[in-house]
């Protein structure tokens, strides 16, 4: 848990984030790139899924995760709610606010980024989380929606729909105090600086924190 009014942010692989305050634990996007121990977590107050793609929700292992956290609020976009057949999921939408413990979760946006025009855009609802006076934004798979007042931005760094210039522009538009990378297991170690260094050099964030797949940081 975080202490002294800080928020603890832990990466758990690719797009999965565990956000903790003294009172509340929120897990976001437990997908196929996560190790098995992520799906054995307990004591969660909320489980959030931004969209249906398997790198954001591993349906097979997610069943055990939800069963291990029977009191957790489970939030997801409307299309994912129609697809999952385990647990009780609450639909998250753009602008909808949900309070869990000392955390307020607000839905941001509605559609996934375009991968190729021939593919339909699935639903995608990012989350702006207010905790301990800090606002944390995780957009899911899109750069389209830019909320105001973001302290910490978890920026998707690499995917079939991303482009480095658009990543940099998105960070510039959000203008966070701190930026950290997520959605990056599609990038090789050798190529990683080609993406992350551009965010550092050109994104304009106050601070850039490079977290490994199992690393944590604390934000006052």
What kind of region is each of these model predictions?
Residues 82-84, 162-175:
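A short, conserved beta-to-alpha structural element at the edge of catalytic cores
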Residues 71-79, 178-185:
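Short internal beta-strands
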